[in-house]
Amino acid sequence: MGQQKTILRALAGETQAVPPIWMMRQAGRYLPEYRATRAQAGDFLSLCYNPELAAEVTLQPIRRYGFDAAILFADILLVPQALGADLWFVTGEGPRLSTITTDADFAKLGPASDVHETLSPIYETVRILSKELPSETTLIGFAGAPWTVATYMIAGRGTPDQGPAHALMQENTPLFEALLARITEATISYLSAQIEAGAEVVKIFDSWAGSLKGEAFDKYALEPARQITAALKARHPHVPVIGFPREAGEKYIGFHAATGVDCVALDNSVDPEWAAEHVQVAGCVQGNLASRHMVSGGEALVQDTRRIVKAFSKGPHIFNLGHGITPDADPDNVQRMIDTVREGA
């Protein structure tokens, strides 16, 4: 029955009359049931590392909305923590990490093979979900792309322009490339373990890919994505991979072929008609409604949703947002989006 799942059919290249739908950050603070479970966990990281509660928040949007996929509840910064970086979250400000800016800092990191000790609760979450999800729902695992994860490890926090990572790339290229290689190796291990625990699809989030230009994009966004995808395909040939090089612009063209991913997720700066012509010709695309519509709602939500469905209707497409849903979103607007996508069913 596995291939009857709508997400897997899209990822296999099938054009469907009604695209399957899920939503980045669909388990999140916009949902009252999520806020209640997070309060029970105590804090964000405790929620990530509690398999029963992490599975519960992953299931909540499936119960409420009947999305075609559930995405594992975790965080891209668990990998640096598993490598030995200190990680904590500051309320209202986001993540903080101990920084990796010198060879001595890098030497303190553990080998990629050691990540499973820290990450084993995540695999348990996947195992619980693979048992508890409805049979028609696809389970998606994920990790951050090496470049994006490195930007946090180098700066110790999110930065508007990823300046510290760009500076290290220029000033100590061997260290920068060694860090990327370590993250790449750990990511292959992590995603492979998620698949072995029951993930049916994996997604690589390169949230800051757009700040890499020209040759740097090819070396530090495309190449790690290619390495991760190739390694996963060698071990798990039937498991599809979704790549998300956010704000890659023209570099979305050719991303399927250059990396080997089965699907390319598009941010909402991308014109859907342009992407249908230039990106979807190479394979499945995912996206790309602006997440602001989940806040504002109204007729604009319906019109933009219909436009995206129509633009991508001639090829394989998974409907999603172009960015994660925000905490101020209205849950009713999510339902309206889903109803609009499925109105042709």
UniProtKB/Swiss-Prot annotation:
Keywords, sorted A to Z: Cytoplasm, Decarboxylase, Lyase, Porphyrin biosynthesis
Binding site for substrate: R25, Q26, A27, G28, R29, D75, Y152, S207, H323
Pathway in which the depicted protein is active: Porphyrin-containing compound metabolism; protoporphyrin-IX biosynthesis; coproporphyrinogen-III from 5-aminolevulinate: step 4/4
GO CC terms: cytosol
Role description: Catalyzes the decarboxylation of four acetate groups of uroporphyrinogen-III to yield coproporphyrinogen-III.
NCBIfam families with a match to the protein in the record: hemE (TIGR01464)
Entry's family note: Belongs to the uroporphyrinogen decarboxylase family.
Protein name per the record: Uroporphyrinogen decarboxylase
Protein species of origin: Ruegeria sp. (strain TM1040)
